[in-house]
């Protein structure tokens, strides 16, 4: 047993460290706490894959232990029949080639099925008209446009429950990634491109969304709240916003193109009448030039905002280095 423990010690240490690191990153494992049909499908796929792979690892460890114990060198063992000249075993070679292929197929089939099924509205609510929301990433903020309601929000999102949401995802500058873990997986946002993604919330609540792709200095602050409310409350919010929120002018939208953090904002019109970031990949850069912003190396001592007038949307607690 001592010999067995010594032989397995490196593997046990590696397994323990793996568990520690994995669990250390799961203090808020919201991916495994789905609140919508899309996230639930993806969570089921993740758990299926983990279970399948754990089974394979278990089989490998059992076989490893059996071989280690059965064929270990020990006193009184007759090694006379041992023949070091091994010419191969066709049957075994076929087996350990076919098994990995079958494993890959077994994992690929449900994965491909899930990926294709998520390209359309959830089955349970496919007959409902989806709410269209344009999600635009700008360093370091998210802009959400409701074209049918003529509303635009910054760094927060209101959606009705039990209704599919069709996101039209794009970026004004850096390549980003829209991710609301409890509602579904991430999808990339790229300048000059428009990506579609269906998500849905089944429960009233507030869920956290974020940028899942590194975009520079304040990448970690590019988060937003998703407020899932009843259809009635959503309609009330729409009506109130249309009547009370200020209009979004082109000049104000240009200010949002500056690479800064801003607070939550609400407008009773959208930027879609000024620019379609899915077609125009240069708008943000041109807007920054109009405002006097000068892009410089991160190692430069030059202040890129030196010629920029104070941005009325900028967070008051931001500090520039």
From Swiss-Prot:
Enzyme Commission code(s) on record: 1.10.3.-
Keyword hit for Oxidoreductase: yes
PROSITE patterns, A to Z: COX2_CUA, COX2_TM, PROKAR_LIPOPROTEIN
Signal sequence bounds: 1-25
Record GO biological process: ATP synthesis coupled electron transport
Lipidation positions, renumbered (S-diacylglycerol cysteine): 26
Residue ranges of the region described as Disordered: 294-321
Catalysed reaction, written as an equation: 2 a quinol + O2 = 2 a quinone + 2 H2O
SUPFAM superfamilies found in the cross-reference section: Cupredoxins, Cytochrome c oxidase subunit II-like, transmembrane region
Database matches in PANTHER family: CYTOCHROME BO(3) UBIQUINOL OXIDASE SUBUNIT 2, CYTOCHROME C OXIDASE, SUBUNIT II
Name of protein: Quinol oxidase subunit 2
Organism: Bacillus spizizenii (strain ATCC 23059 / NRRL B-14472 / W23)
Taxonomic placement: Bacteria, Bacillati, Bacillota, Bacilli, Bacillales
């Amino acid at each position: 047993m001592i010999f067995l423990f010594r032989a397995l010690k490196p593997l046990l240490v590696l397994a323990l460290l793996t568990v520690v690191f994995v669990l250390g990153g799961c203090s808020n494992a919201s991916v495994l706490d789905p609140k919508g049909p899309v996230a639930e499908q993806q969570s089921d796929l993740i758990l299926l894959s983990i279970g399948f792979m754990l089974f394979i690892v278990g089989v490998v460890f059992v076989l490893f232990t059996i071989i280690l114990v059965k064929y270990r060198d020990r006193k009184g063992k007759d090694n006379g029949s041992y023949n070091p000249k091994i010419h191969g075993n066709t049957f075994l070679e076929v087996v350990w080639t076919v098994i990995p292929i079958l494993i890959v197929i077994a994992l690929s089939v449900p994965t491909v099925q899930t990926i294709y099924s998520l390209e359309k509205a959830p089955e349970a609510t496919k007959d409902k008209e989806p709410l269209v929301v344009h999600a635009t990433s700008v360093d370091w903020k998210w802009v959400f446009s409701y074209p049918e309601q003529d509303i635009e929000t910054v760094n927060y999102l209101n959606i009705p429950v039990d209704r599919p949401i069709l996101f039209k995802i794009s970026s004004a500058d850096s390549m980003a990634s829209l991710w609301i873990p409890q509602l579904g997986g991430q999808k990339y946002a790229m300048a000059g491109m428009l990506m579609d993604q269906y998500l849905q919330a089944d429960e009233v609540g507030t869920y956290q969304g974020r940028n899942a792709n590194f975009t520079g200095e304040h990448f970690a602050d590019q988060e937003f709240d998703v407020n899932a409310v009843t259809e009635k409350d959503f309609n009330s919010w729409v009506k109130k916003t249309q009547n009370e929120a200020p209009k979004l002018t082109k000049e104000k939208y240009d200010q949002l193109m500056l690479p800064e953090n801003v607070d939550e904002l609400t407008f009773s019109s959208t930027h879609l009448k000024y620019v379609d970031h899915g077609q125009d990949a240069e708008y943000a850069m041109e807007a920054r030039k109009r405002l006097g912003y000068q892009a410089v190396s991160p190692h430069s001592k030059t202040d890129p905002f030196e010629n920029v007038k104070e941005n009325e949307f900028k967070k008051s607690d931001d500090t520039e280095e």
